[in-house]
Regions:
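Conserved NTP phosphate-binding and transfer environment spanning the P-loop NTPase/kinase superfamily
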Residues: 1-140, 144
Length: 146
């Protein structure tokens, strides 16, 4: 798998406009366990924002994981989706990301030296940003902080 990742990094280095990478979570649920996002054909609304973002037009707010759509960036016309639920969908909680980072670390470790250094570096940068976001500013630079 590490060789596969390296292959695509090599291909990406040869193209003039490498593809952008986006993360989505279609499966966020509310307190009753119901999906917040309607899914299916409505996923095109998110894909439209992604294409707008690639063209430099999609509105976003910077977070520790990258640009996230603003509340009004994704067309919700005709959807029964409140600002509160949309906010829940778009929320980036660094504390939740700590678990994701740990799982990613396990995956990267499985591939040992065959995991491309570029991917390890991206992972380490993300982990640092998340750690900094959950570490109170007065602890940065002290034991337990960054």
């Amino acid at each position: 798998m590490g060789d596969y990742f390296q292959h695509w990094l090599d291909v990406g280095a040869q193209v003039t406009r490498p593809p952008k990478i986006f993360r989505v979570n279609w499966f966020r649920t509310n307190e009753n366990g119901r999906y917040l996002w309607p899914g299916f054909g409505d996923n095109l609304r998110v894909l439209k924002w992604i294409l707008e973002r690639c063209d430099g037009k999609g509105k976003a707010v910077d977070t520790v994981i990258g640009g996230v759509p603003t509340l009004d960036a994704i067309d919700r016309s005709g959807l029964a989706l409140s600002d509160t639920d949309m906010g829940r969908l778009l929320r980036v909680d660094p504390a939740e990301w700590v678990e994701a980072i740990a799982g990613q670390e396990e995956l990267l470790h499985m591939f040992g030296d065959r995991m491309p250094k570029e991917l390890r570096g991206e992972h380490e940068q993300l982990a640092r940003r998340i750690n900094a976001a959950i570490t109170p500013p007065d602890l940065v630079g002290r034991e337990g902080g960054e």
